[in-house]
Amino acid sequence: MNIFKKKTTPKDALRTSKREMAVATRGIEREITSLQLEEKRLVAEIKKTAKTGNEAATKILARQLVRLRQQITNLQGSRAQIRGVTTHTQALYASTSISSGMKGATKAMVAMNKQMAPTKQAKVIKDFQKQSAQLDMTIEMMSEAIDETLDKDEAEEETEDLTNQVLDEIGVGVASQLSSAPKGRIATKTAAPPASTAATNKNSESSEVDELEKRLASLRRI
């Protein structure tokens, strides 16, 4: 016994068997083809002999035809048996492959069952619930912070938009006048201007002050 000889695997055995069966099948098919050609020749000869009226020769040829057709039938049966053996061998190999696969799957399931024992599963579920709760709290805190920031930004944006809208309505000139207007009550007494200047601008100043007071009052209502 050669200890260094490579062990034959089921796949190698199947390949060898299929090759041998294919060779045998081709040999039988060649023989069947040859006999079928001989059958055609013999049939033609029987017809020719029958036309001459030679009854004895015709019967001898007919017996040869019967034996020939029987040989063809036997060879066809052998070919069918070889094909059946090939199919059976392939089925056995498939069963072997399935068995090997089932063994591997069984080992995998055993390993998973060991890793996922009830106590380990309970611990995994508990850890998952804990981490999930922490994640929910973190997300909630982040959402509150984001909402608060957005609310402040929206309030500031709304205030700024409203202010700009009011300033657009009253005009940039009025805004400039408001920024340069005297602080406190507008009617407060100040140092007396020169007599000539007071006499000239008295009417115009009075009308401007009245207009500013009206617009300031409207801004306060807004």
From Swiss-Prot:
Residues 179-222 are annotated as: Disordered. It is found in: Endosome. InterPro entries: Snf7_fam. PANTHER family: CHARGED MULTIVESICULAR BODY PROTEIN. Its main location: other. This is Vacuolar protein sorting-associated protein 2 homolog 2. It comes from Arabidopsis thaliana (Mouse-ear cress). Keywords: Coiled coil, Endosome, Protein transport, Transport. Residues 26-83, 143-222 form a coiled coil.
